[in-house]
């Protein structure tokens, strides 16, 4: 059985690194949304985790019940974060499999 060529191995590693960087860039540029309260609160974030938009339905704005609004905002943030993690795992899956 022939020994693998070192230059071939290095070329494959370089190609994999370039593809990994491309996918990481794609994830960073993506926008992921999450919601809570059947869509009453929505959060949009970039793949970097930066929150870019929060939308709150007027019906949940009650000065006498701030706790519910806080819970909904937190829930929407958590939903968006979970969606982002799932998306990143999906995109990075081939690299995890290739590395063992």
From Swiss-Prot:
Disulfide bonds: none annotated. One of its GO terms (molecular function) is DNA binding. Keywords: Cytoplasm, DNA-binding. SUPFAM superfamilies: YbaB-like (SSF82607). The keyword Ribonucleoprotein does not apply. It holds the Pfam family YbaB_DNA_bd. InterPro entries: YbaB-like_sf, YbaB/EbfC. Its main location: cytoplasm. GO terms for cellular component: bacterial nucleoid; cytosol. It is found in: Cytoplasm, Nucleoid. Gene3D superfamilies: Nucleoid-associated protein YbaB-like domain. NCBIfam families: DNA_YbaB_EbfC (TIGR00103). Belongs to the YbaB/EbfC family. Homodimer. Binds to DNA and alters its conformation. May be involved in regulation of gene expression, nucleoid organization and DNA protection. This is Nucleoid-associated protein ckrop_0143.
